Structure formats: structure tokens, C-alpha cells
């Protein structure tokens, strides 16, 4: 479905902060949002913009690493999202780095943690050699240069929308409106209770 929509989702932008921002770059009060919706927007646009929005947020983190002096030749991907070829390509195109999908993507975090623990307690002397023996790439994605300009502009739009909406998120945090409690029951403001 998402592959039927061009890069940039025809200007539909998704901010994926459904749980606030959990990295140190933004606000824990941030919320998710779709921007750029029109009568021409369909489910395919929403699906692709959701994938792209997650990648814009991740790109923001990668850019912070780069600005601090870290550099990447390629990135390794794991988890459930790696089972989507279109999402892997979108990630690669937005990050502008090759993406290596690991063979055992579901367990690669455990393998990595075990290798680090082994190194930490002195069981592993040559981490590079042990990693080569235990971590295998299933497939590699390379950036598509035809979408580079579109994604660069959409990354700017993402940052502008994110920054512009921060005061709105702060306002909503303190607004007297319907909220959901931690136990998943609804609470309402006094305005709703009196009606």
C-alpha cells in the first residue's frame, strides 16, 4: 500500500511522538500529529507518511550524533520493522546511508548484549572477530538518489512542524480537556461532568 505513494507522501507529514519524546532532543510533552491532510489523502498516504515520520525522527537523532563528531558508513537494522522492504528502503533513503538488515533480526539485540557482556568480563578478547562469526547480514539496502531532494525538504518540514507545535503540546498538557488516566479509564473536565 505505502509503495503506491511517492517519496514525501505528497506532502503528508506524520509526527510520531505518540508517547512524547524519549530522547534528550525534545519535549516529553510532544504528541503525534498528521499534517498536510487534504481530500486527496488516502490510507496509503497515511501509511507511507507514518513510516517516513518515524524515519525523520530517527534521522534527527542520527544528525545529533553526527554533529557531536560520530560518523557512520552504514547502519544495522533489527526488530519487526525490518520485515517491511518498503520501510527498509524509506529508512535508507532518509538516512542517506546503507542499511544492513541482520539475519537474526529478532534476536540480534540479545546477541549483541551477550557479546558485550562477554567482552566486559574478559571472555572475549577479539570483539571484531567474534562479531563477524555471530552477526550476519541478511540483505543490504542502498540510498535511492532520486528521492534524496524530496526527503531533504521533508526533513526540514518535519523539524519546522515539530518545533512550531511544541508550544501547542505544552498548552494541551495543561488544558482542561478529556484525558485518559493510567488505568485506561476516562476522566473528564468539570465542563463535561456538569452536562
Residue ranges and their predicted role:
Residues 1-195:
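Glycine/Thr-rich phosphate-binding loops that ligate phosphate moieties of nucleotide
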Amino acid at each position: 500500500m505505502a509503495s503506491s505513494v511517492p517519496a514525501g507522501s505528497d506532502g503528508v507529514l506524520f509526527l510520531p511522538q505518540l508517547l512524547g519524546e524519549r530522547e534528550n532532543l525534545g519535549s516529553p510533552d510532544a504528541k503525534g500529529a498528521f499534517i498536510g491532510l487534504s481530500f486527496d489523502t488516502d490510507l496509503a498516504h497515511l501509511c507511507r507518511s507514518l513510516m517516513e515520520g518515524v524515519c525523520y525522527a530517527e534521522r534527527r537523532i542520527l544528525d545529533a550524533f553526527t554533529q557531536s563528531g560520530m560518523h557512520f558508513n552504514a547502519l544495522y537494522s533489527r526488530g519487526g520493522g525490518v520485515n517491511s522492504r518498503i520501510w527498509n528502503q524509506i529508512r535508507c533513503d532518509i538516512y542517506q546511508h546503507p542499511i544492513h538488515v541482520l539475519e537474526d533480526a529478532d534476536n540480534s539485540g540479545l546477541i549483541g548484549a551477550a557479546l558485550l557482556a562477554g567482552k566486559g568480563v574478559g571472555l572475549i578478547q577479539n570483539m571484531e572477530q567474534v562479531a563477524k562469526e555471530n552477526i550476519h547480514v541478511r540483505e543490504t539496502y542502498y540510498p535511492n538518489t532520486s528521492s534524496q531532494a524530496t526527503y531533504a525538504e521533508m526533513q526540514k518540514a518535519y523539524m519546522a512542524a515539530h518545533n512550531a507545535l511544541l508550544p501547542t503540546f505544552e498548552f494541551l498538557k495543561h488544558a482542561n480537556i478529556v484525558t485518559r488516566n493510567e488505568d485506561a479509564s476516562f476522566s473528564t473536565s468539570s465542563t463535561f461532568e456538569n452536562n
